[in-house]
A protein has these predicted regions:
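Hydrophobic helical membrane-anchoring modules
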Residues: 1-6, 17, 147-150, 173-235
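Conserved donor nucleotide-binding strand/loop of the catalytic core
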Residues: 35-38, 49-80
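Short, well-formed alpha-helical segments that are part of the catalytic scaffolds
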Residues: 15-29
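Short loop->beta transition adjacent to catalytic acidic/histidine clusters or analogous donor-positioning motifs
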Residues: 3-6, 27-38, 47, 59-60
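A conserved acidic beta->alpha catalytic loop
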Residues: 41-49, 93
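Donor nucleotide-sugar binding loop of glycosyltransferases
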Residues: 15-18, 44, 70, 96
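Acceptor/aglycone-binding surface of glycosyltransferases and processive sugar-polymer synthases
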Residues: 64-80, 85, 97-179, 204-216, ...
């Protein structure tokens, strides 16, 4: 498959400490394709909005009036994307944009409609952090696989890449407003029988002191989302 343009969708919520660094890395990431960078501010209350305004003259910047959640921000960004491939990029420096070229390979070769960047199937370095997070991720991924019939190793990864056609198919079905979007994306990928590949990626996880936002309540909510989006939502 030929990829002339890559859309990079970046949801932002209170990331003033890392935002400039992430955007610099995204802009410098080595891609032969044209980049379309789409940033969605999800009602930030720090200086993130002011920082994003500095980039508004050269990239797409969307400002939500209030905090609506990652799912809402991503859905808005997906709707604006015009690239042949669409990459999700968090604004927290946990994931390295230099790896875009690796993530795109299965699509370029015509083997995949969707690519997940896995933090567990990798020869790249990754920061060792909380066992509780690892256990929660593995448990949620196992439960998701049980419902979807897929064999994904890292459902909660930020790095998910979609062909334009794949996103066109699943976007009308997406409803999640917050972190449930990770579960819903995987459920819709399975419902639409899209071809999924995994690529190993590096990972530099944050501590709560660094600004990590997800917590045990999100884990419990994810269990409900797995049941909801797999049993009670149509594809």
């Amino acid at each position: 498959m030929e990829i002339k343009k890559v859309s990079i969708v970046i949801p932002v919520f209170n990331e003033e400490k890392t935002l400039r660094s992430v955007l610099d890395l995204v802009e410098k990431s080595p891609l032969s394709s044209e980049k379309e960078i789409i940033m969605i501010d999800d009602g930030s209350t720090d200086k993130s909005r002011e920082i994003l305004k500095e980039y508004a003259s050269k990239h797409k910047v969307i400002f939500l009036e209030k905090n609506c959640g990652k799912g809402t921000a991503l859905r808005r960004g997906f709707a604006e994307a015009t690239g042949d491939a669409i990459i999700i990029q968090d604004a927290d420096l946990e994931y390295d944009p230099i790896e875009y070229s690796f993530l795109l390979q299965p699509i370029l070769r015509g083997n995949a409609d969707v690519v997940y960047g896995s933090r567990f199937v990798t020869a790249f370095p990754r920061r060792v952090l909380y066992f509780s997070h690892y256990l929660a991720n593995k448990s949620l991924t196992f439960l998701s696989n049980l419902f979807t019939g897929l064999n994904i190793s890292d459902m909660e990864t930020c790095y998910k890449v979609f062909t334009r056609q794949a996103m066109k198919e699943i976007l009308p079905c997406l409803k999640a407003k917050r972190f449930g979007i990770e579960v819903e994306l995987t459920a819709q990928i399975a419902k639409h029988r899209l071809r999924v590949y995994e690529v190993g990626i590096s990972y530099k996880g944050r501590t709560y002191k660094d600004g990590k936002k997800i917590n045990w309540k999100d884990g419990l909510a994810a269990v409900w989302h797995i049941i909801r989006f797999n049993l009670f939502t149509r594809g």
